[in-house]
Amino acid sequence: MKKFNVSTLRAALPDGRRMGLRVLLGAALLQTAACSFAAEDAVSIAPPIKDEAVKTAGTETAVFAGGCFWGVQGVFQHVQGVKKAVSGYAGGKADTAQYERVSEGDTGHAESVEVTFDPSQVSYGTLLQVFFSVAHNPTELNRQGPDHGTQYRSAIFPESSEQKAVAQAYIAQLDSAKSFNAPIVTKIETYNGFYPAEDYHQNFLTTHPTYPYIVINDLPKVGQLKQLFADRYSEQPVLVK
């Protein structure tokens, strides 16, 4: 069955129409190939053996890239202890951190989410566990579901040496345990800044729950979060204001 290359098709259109195209493609998928493009089942994985030292005050930030930021943001907005989850861009330079440019796939940016969290309520290691098991498929190289390109790569941008050590150890742990059917391709990249995405991308899953793309690819992830992390799940999402 021929698969739609959403990223290539939408790159030819202005931002507003790209979103419309994503909806039209989603509708087509619902009618002709919904099963092929539905969000993959989440994988139940062990928590990290190595985690950050327990912190009792303040907040911390973490940046994750795992395909289209709509779904990744939507998942983390439902995790207890998360104070904010912002869609944006990481990996490239400030002057190319715009959706239209990033969609061309040559900026070095990945669609990313910056998660602000209270480490006394949820650890960085737990966020990694959610990221790998629910938010995306870490075995897909430069793609997630119907979206293709380096801007959809699986990546972690540690903001400290401790975050980097925890992420490296967890990837090694999961690969050693053969937690997935294929090796993890997630890259640990240098953090050089995070650039928030345009306003119309923020809270997209919550504000557009009937968009076919969201219905097929992203809402199932929130359901899987609730199922696998019932003790961590928050019914009310923490929205960007």
Question: Where would I find each of the regions flagged by the language model?
Answer:
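Flexible coil/turn and secondary-structure edge motifs
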Residues: 2-9, 13-16, 22-25, 31, ...
